[in-house]
């Protein structure tokens, strides 16, 4: 799986989604980004965004783990809190509203087609190449953890295109 500077697959996805947005002009150079996220994707987005010249603001519930928040702040992220009871839905709503109000780019990784597009272009082909024997992939089935659905969509479509009859399974982490 393609990875980014943190070594995690989500780092590759964050960088890939940013590159796709830049490429189509949705994310102009220097435009700040906002996203509702606090995990590995947040770390990858912060690192990649800042090295690429995009200030990153993360919106998360106030009860997100303190160590994670401290780490993200040290990396250079700005954090906006929502009430804990608002959960991810509240954080996403505030991120979207903040982007609209300030003219920032809202990555919206859970609903953005750049997520599966990245996996169609990078992760899926990397998997097929790594399993290729005599010109064809030997993958007959694959199980993929499902969060946003981007990985299973992009990788699943790629594997099925290269390996007729391949079965794609999901696992909820």
Predicted feature descriptions by range:
Residues 1-173:
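PLP-dependent amino-acid enzyme catalytic core
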């Amino acid at each position: 799986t393609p990875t980014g500077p943190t070594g995690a697959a989500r780092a590759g996805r964050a960088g890939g989604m940013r590159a796709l947005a830049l490429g189509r002009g949705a994310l102009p150079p220097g435009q700040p980004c906002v996203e509702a996220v606090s995990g590995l994707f947040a770390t990858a987005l912060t690192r990649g965004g800042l090295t690429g010249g995009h200030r990153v603001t993360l919106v998360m519930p106030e009860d997100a783990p303190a160590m994670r928040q401290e780490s993200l702040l040290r990396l250079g992220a700005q954090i906006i809190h929502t009430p804990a009871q608002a959960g991810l839905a509240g954080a996403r709503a505030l991120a979207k509203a903040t982007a609209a109000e300030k003219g920032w780019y809202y990555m919206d990784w859970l609903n953005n087609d750049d997520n599966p597009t990245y996996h169609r272009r990078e992760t899926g082909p990397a998997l097929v190449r790594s399993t290729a024997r005599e010109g064809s992939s030997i993958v007959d089935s694959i199980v993929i953890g499902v969060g946003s659905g981007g990985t299973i969509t992009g990788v699943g479509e790629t594997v099925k295109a290269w390996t007729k009859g391949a079965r794609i399974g999901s696992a909820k982490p």
